[in-house]
Amino acid sequence: MAHKKGASSSRNGRDSAAQRLGVKRFGGQLVSAGEIIIRQRGTKFHPGDLVGRGGDDTLFALAAGSVQFGTKRGRKTVSIVPQQ
């Protein structure tokens, strides 16, 4: 294996694709059951009422309604307020 770079070669050019994390549905927005609300790594947001958490910490709606952000015991939470 050469330890000097040859002509027209480069040591750069490696990068990973973005993970597309973040809030997908914002406060007050209507969602249907199963819709992804937040994609995250770790529990930056915790699930509240009618919100489930996937194996990769994704938060999703368990029922149709509007998204509501709040805090509970110092943690940021996401809940669903059911439609009347």
Swiss-Prot record:
GO cellular component: cytosolic large ribosomal subunit
Keyword Ribonucleoprotein: yes
Family: Belongs to the bacterial ribosomal protein bL27 family.
Signal peptide start and end residues: none
Record's keyword annotation contains rRNA-binding: no
PANTHER family: LARGE RIBOSOMAL SUBUNIT PROTEIN BL27M, RIBOSOMAL PROTEIN L27
Domain of life: Bacteria
Keyword terms: Ribonucleoprotein, Ribosomal protein
Molecular functions (GO terms): structural constituent of ribosome
UniProt-listed Pfam families: Ribosomal_L27
Matching InterPro entries: Ribosomal_bL27, Ribosomal_bL27_CS
GO biological process: translation
Record's protein name: Large ribosomal subunit protein bL27
